[in-house]
Amino acid sequence: MDQVLETIKRAHQGDKAARDRLVQENMPLVWSIVRRFSNRGYEPEDLFQIGSIGLLKAIDRFDTAYEVKFSTYAVPLIIGEIRRYLRDDGMLKVSRSL
């Protein structure tokens, strides 16, 4: 876990290689979440791309002071990004405000 935190710190300082490494190491996490949404009528590769956006947001927003694993923090952001896409891409547009 210390190695992951160090990699995240380097990514926050602008190290592109560290960011790429985090993305590569967490691709299986994104795929496991994409499988949950496999019966929604969308191509898995499309959902993977959307989930990857959530992963990148998690990398950028993760605070190393949090006492949680990175994957625990990233999962809700990845799921949220996919759900937002499914909601906004649907045939019926529903306003989020009341």
Which residue ranges define each predicted feature?
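Short, intrinsically disordered, charge-balanced linker/junction segments flanking boundaries
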Residues: 93-98
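Alpha-helical promoter-recognition and RNA polymerase-docking modules of transcription initiation factors
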Residues: 1-92
